[in-house]
């Protein structure tokens, strides 16, 4: 094998293994959408013809072309970022994630992100990791600077989180239990990653992140389908696992209404 060919092989290999999971088209997204909604005629026609790759491209074009979108949590025409959020965004690029103000400096979760890393055995630290508090600052940093590195890394981390945090069915009462050390792996992890309160946080924040990163080349048609399928999974999960009472229930219900009214 000559040096040039060897270099190409190694580079190709690095592209596949060095940055985690590749984005993939989720054709089930079309069954979750109202394809009779005004503006989605091309999407519907392409999907019915079995051209889902083209349909996904048309769907992304539709979202990017909209001009009447209101995002209550941020003014897209006047995006600013403070020093603290800029730090969270820059640290996030290196997988040093701002999770909790009570645990500073923030912890690094590894080049190959370990979403189950638990440096201090405090449930709040593990729960709040899954609120992704650095994602919106990364979006602001992207829009203010125009630097694609923020969008590229966000898309990578978003897909990485999906792949490494599968939703395992469990009784909703288990989400609030203190770990006794007997439950391990995915079953233990789902208690933290998919607790309804954390899911509702993501449900609200991702409406803002969607708009912030939408113009990016890293926001591909395939990524769009993964995003929408995951977003739908979040909403369905909350509907089946509302907290019984208290402020958690209030927040979960509020964010469901919020997500519906935003109409991604």
Task: Please place each PLM-identified region on the residue numbering.
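Bacterial Sec-dependent N-terminal signal peptides
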Residues: 1-24
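Extended hydrophobic/Leu-rich segments
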Residues: 5-11, 43, 63, 178, ...
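Helix-centric, low-specificity signal for extended rod-like, repetitive segments
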Residues: 12, 37, 57-59, 124, ...
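Extreme N-terminal leader/anchor segments
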Residues: 23-100
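Intrinsically disordered, low-complexity N-terminal tails
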Residues: 96-97, 104-109, 119
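Aromatic-lined, polymer-binding surfaces characteristic
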Residues: 107-111, 121-264
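Cytochrome P450 substrate-recognition site 1
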Residues: 114-118
């Amino acid at each position: 094998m000559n040096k040039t060919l060897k270099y190409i092989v190694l580079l190709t290999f690095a592209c596949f293994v060095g940055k985690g999971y590749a984005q993939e088209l989720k054709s089930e997204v079309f069954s979750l959408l109202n394809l009779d909604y005004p503006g989605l005629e091309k999407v519907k026609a392409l999907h019915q013809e079995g051209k889902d790759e083209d349909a996904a491209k048309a769907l992304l074009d539709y979202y990017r072309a909209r001009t009447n979108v209101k995002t209550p949590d941020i003014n897209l025409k006047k995006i600013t970022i403070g020093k603290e959020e800029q730090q969270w965004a820059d640290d996030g690029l290196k997988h040093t994630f701002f999770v909790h103000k009570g645990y500073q400096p923030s912890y690094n979760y590894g080049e190959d992100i370990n979403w189950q890393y638990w440096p201090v055995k405090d449930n709040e630290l593990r729960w709040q990791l899954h609120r992704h508090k650095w994602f919106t600052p990364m979006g602001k940093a992207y829009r203010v600077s125009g630097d694609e590195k923020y969008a590229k890394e966000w898309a990578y981390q978003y897909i990485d989180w999906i792949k490494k945090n599968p939703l395992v069915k469990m009784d909703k009462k288990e989400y609030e239990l203190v770990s006794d050390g007997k439950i391990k792996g995915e079953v233990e992890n789902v208690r933290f990653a998919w607790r309804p309160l954390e899911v509702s946080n993501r449900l609200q924040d991702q409406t803002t992140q969607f708009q912030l990163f939408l113009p990016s080349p890293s926001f591909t048609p395939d990524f769009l389908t993964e995003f929408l399928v995951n977003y739908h999974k979040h909403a369905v999960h909350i509907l089946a696992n509302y907290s019984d009472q208290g402020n958690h229930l209030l927040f979960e219900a509020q964010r469901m209404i919020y997500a519906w009214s935003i109409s991604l």
